[in-house]
Amino acid sequence: MPSQKIRIRLKAYDHKLLDTSVGEIVDTAKRTGARVAGPIPLPTVINKYCVLRGPHVDKKSREQFEIRTHKRLIDILEPTQQTVDALMKLDLSAGVDVEIKL
């Protein structure tokens, strides 16, 4: 696969879980002889939700919740066939969303 690039984008709510998954991908890619650019931390998306505490009158009493979505980007430059096979066989955690673009 000459002059190709694999771009892997990972998303997770837990940043520790995300960093361990990124480490596994980088180790696998380097072990098979590909060059790796990254991991590049992308901006964290924070979704905030404001909910009334009580079911009735008190509009002033509210509770706030937030969900943080952490993201990382990895570019694998000059991937070999062994790199692609190893990445396909890699078993990552259930809480990590992986998007792969060739």
From Swiss-Prot:
GO terms for molecular function: structural constituent of ribosome; tRNA binding. Pfam families: Ribosomal_S10. InterPro entries: Ribosomal_uS10 (IPR001848), Ribosomal_uS10_CS (IPR018268), Ribosomal_uS10_dom (IPR027486), Ribosomal_uS10_dom_sf (IPR036838). GO terms for biological process: translation. It comes from the Bacteria. NCBIfam families: PRK00596.1 (NF001861), rpsJ_bact (TIGR01049). Belongs to the universal ribosomal protein uS10 family. This is Small ribosomal subunit protein uS10.
